[in-house]
Amino acid sequence: HSTVTELCTKSDIIEVGYRAATRMQMASQEAVVPERTTPLEAVSRGSVWLVTGGARGVTAACARAFGKQYGLRLALVGSTELVAVEPGWLDLDDAGVKTLKGRLMVEAKQRGEDPRRAWKVVEKTIEIRRSLAAFDAEGIEAHYFPCDLSEQEVVRQMVADVQCQVGPVRGIVHGAGFESACRFEKKTHAGFSATVFPKALGLEYILAATDEKMLGAVIGFGSTSGRFGGHGQADYAMANDLLAKIVGRVRADRNIPATVFHWHAWDEVGMASRPESRFVLEQFGLKFMPLAEGVQH
């Protein structure tokens, strides 16, 4: 009866529950997180943390702060296979990068390659190399491992490489993600897979590959879209909600600290800072969170 009633009732509420005939719904409320009174062994100096998406954007900024504060050794995981770049390219300013982009795209076209794809790999490689240099400059030990998080065997091998080359994984920060907003009817299977699989299945695969006895903490980086939705983000919202459910299960089943940060839009770095995303968000009067504030959280 309750199910039929819900289906026939006009309401903006999409998640409801019933307990002893009492209708319940999800609600957000402000709460102060109590400080931990005992140290967490997983974040002791020298512990190895695996950080997906940790070489670029928001997650890289957080990983640098996290690694420096606690003296962690970081295994940064990304989807980009690094290509050879000239050392001088890392020092180029915006104008220099623009000139380089034009030259390399022309050369790629002459070789019969997709110019945009060829440049994208170089662009990401430069960003990752710069990021690794920033980790090194702050005295943080960081190693980069390329990996397709949607392929279980590839993930298993990556985790094995991390544990062999760096050490047993004590903690995970799962920040990898992909977002491409568009109307629902324009969503494709490939786009859905690229959005949902790394964010949700990727963490499942990593958890399956790590030593359960050594793993002491799990952190997921999600988005407010995972709770409130977002324009053109049906798949992205689903991915982030799934992430929260998976991390919740980790906390219950493994009895270790595990949580998800559903981040607000960051300024300066991250998906929301892209011109096309920023334009849409600004139309709704959204205020962006400064980089320094986000890292402090």
Predicted feature residues:
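A short, basic/flexible loop-to-alpha-helix module at the beginning of a structural domain
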Residues: 26-46
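4′-phosphopantetheine-dependent carrier domains
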Residues: 1-13, 19-23, 43-297
